[in-house]
Regions:
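A structural signal for multi-pass alpha-helical bundles of membrane permease subunits
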Residues: 1-184
Length: 184
């Protein structure tokens, strides 16, 4: 919110925005080897570490989506809240954030889908078999000469179930976001 509203007024916020967005242009494969070395050095090669890394790697896309949505909200809402006596935190929490429900649902769904379906980061960071994700567990069902199809397809259903549950609960906001983006 602060980046979007102050980008034109302050060079700092503009540079911060471009700093976040520039991280989207660096593919994971470029930073994979240094990331593994640093993750091992900082003991981030576990579930907590990979969760932290997912949050950090999700910031650029989430910042991009939120700044685009906040730009569409008229500044007159901010001014009206200031006239009513709201401070900046109240403006964001009581005026701006409720308007951002479709964007928040979109960010949550995209972040969930990205982290849930990711294969590369857990493959290179998680060496302990007890901490592997379901996607890595599916990789085990294929051997050099055969595939255990019964277990493989059962694991596919296990991986699909959370995605369907998230979609069913967020369906209303997904449709609102799609319709809002389609009509000018």
């Amino acid at each position: 919110y602060a980046i979007t509203r102050n980008r034109k007024k302050s060079k700092f916020f503009s540079l911060m925005y471009y700093y976040f967005i520039s991280a989207m242009f660096i593919p994971f494969q470029v930073i994979m080897l240094p990331l593994v070395v640093q993750a091992n050095a900082f003991h981030l090669d576990n579930i907590y570490g990979i969760t932290f890394l997912y949050i950090i790697f999700g910031l650029p896309m989430n910042t991009f989506l939120y700044t685009g949505a906040i730009k569409a909200i008229p500044e007159a809402l901010d001014e009206a809240a200031v006239i009513d006596g709201a401070n900046p935190i109240q403006i964001f929490s009581r005026v701006i954030f409720p308007v951002l429900k479709p964007t928040t649902a979109t960010v949550a769904i995209l972040s969930f889908m990205w982290t849930w379906n990711d294969f590369s980061m857990p493959l290179v960071l998680l060496s302990d078999e007890s901490q592997q994700t379901l996607q890595l567990a599916q990789y085990v069902f294929k051997s050099q000469f055969s595939v255990d199809y019964n277990l493989a397809f059962a694991s596919y259903l296990l991986v699909l179930a959370p995605v369907l549950i998230v979609y069913i609960f967020c369906q209303k906001w997904i449709m609102n976001g799609v319709v809002a983006g389609a009509v000018k």
